[in-house]
């Protein structure tokens, strides 16, 4: 299991090839699951959310996490600490273009990154049980 966050993003502003950390990717190789905080791409500065670029670029997008999970060869990807939260009308002072998101929106974003494994959209206090090998 690899648990990742955003503090290790290699580059927090463009140009960058990915919003994820090389360190997390290295640790993820051969893991069963990645558990990582995620922001939905709809909050990006090229959208109409109003979220300042420096805040957006500190996060890892669900689509980049999907790509990382594919490259690492993991079976499961759990997205946590979601920005914006599922069903929220706003993320703090910022709007959510297109309205509140569903868990399927986060799953689709990870799939857009190329991941075809199991995607779990975590909610607060979620628990997870992996099958025994």
Set out the residue ranges of the language-model regions.
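C-terminal regions of proteins
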Residues: 121-133
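Residue-level marker for buried hydrophobic side chains located in beta-strands
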Residues: 1-3, 121
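Cap/insert and terminal regions of metallo-dependent hydrolase folds
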Residues: 8-123
């Amino acid at each position: 299991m690899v648990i990742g966050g955003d503090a290790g993003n290699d580059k927090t502003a463009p140009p960058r090839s990915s919003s994820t950390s090389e360190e997390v990717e290295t640790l993820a190789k051969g893991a069963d699951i990645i558990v990582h905080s995620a922001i939905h791409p709809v909050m990006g500065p090229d959208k109409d959310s109003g979220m300042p670029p420096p805040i957006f670029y500190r996060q890892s997008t669900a689509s980049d996490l999907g790509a990382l999970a594919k490259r690492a060869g993991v079976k499961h990807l759990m997205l946590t600490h979601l920005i914006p939260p599922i069903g929220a009308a706003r993320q703090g002072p910022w709007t959510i273009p297109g309205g509140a998101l569903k868990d399927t929106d986060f799953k689709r974003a990870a799939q857009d990154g190329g991941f075809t494994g199991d995607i779990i959209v975590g909610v607060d206090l979620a628990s997870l049980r992996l099958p025994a090998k």
